[in-house]
Amino acid sequence: MRFEGRVALVSGAASGIGRATALRLAREGASLGALDRNEAGLSQTLREIEALGGKGAVFPCDVSESGAVARAVTASERALGPVDVLANVAGIGDTAGAEGIEDLHDERWALVLAVNLTGPFLLCRAVLPGMAERGRGAVVNVSSLAGRSKSANAGPAYSASKAGLLGLTRHLAYDYGRRGVRVNAICPGGVDTPMIRAAGVSQAPSPEEAELRRKRIEAYRYFMPIPRLSSPEEQAAAIAFLASDEASYINGVALDVNGGLYMA
């Protein structure tokens, strides 16, 4: 197994790509530290890890808060050992400003950047020095097609946060590559997750909102070269590859996992 004897820390592990990544890495032998604000979702992820025969621990954490991140990483390393793999998956979608930047308020801009960009920065800052000291490690950041171009559904805060994450990825890849640590990113497009299904509709959607949701998901097949949404597991497979020794000479890359929606 590719991650036997290694410790992986995954943010956003309560659902979607984060949960799929946690399960994939645990299935391949990693001891898994799972971070998220959603404690019920974390508990479910842990149950699924244990059902696989894996080892895991959960650490409720708001990744946008410096102190919370420091405490969570310390607790994880105390429970599982030093972090060998970090997957920064936690993120929030946002439609504010999608129709015009005048609709994007200061507070929403700050929140989206805090979760999607500051969160990965805080986690990288917490684990990279230890990885460098040990001379090995891998970080995979989940950016987005929106960071490459723009989002068809989200607003400018989301696009800016994901573009910034690509810049952070490249900078850290250069700084830490010579110390045995690789830093890469993936750029998903449409992924069948709770976040994309909830975009633009309320928690208890009306029949009209439910129909809007159905039409949005259906629309992907008309403009994507591979005419469907990705599964979270397909994204997790890409993350696992970049984190593994099979990708030992891949560093500073933004891997498009979006069905050909963005072609560079």
Give each language-model segment a name:
Residues 3-33:
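Canonical Rossmann dinucleotide-binding motif of NAD(H)/NADP(H)-dependent dehydrogenases/reductases
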Residues 97-101, 105-110, 220:
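Substrate-binding pocket helix/loop in short-chain dehydrogenase/reductase
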Residues 98, 240, 251-264:
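Short C-terminal tail/terminal secondary-structure segment
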Residues 124, 161, 169:
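Active-site helix of classical SDR
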Residues 129, 174-175, 248:
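Alpha-helical segment proximal to the catalytic Tyr-Lys
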Residues 144:
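Residue(s) in the substrate-gating loop at a strand-loop-helix junction
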Residues 177, 182, 250-252:
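Short, small/polar-rich loop/turn modules that mediate ligand/substrate recognition or access, typified
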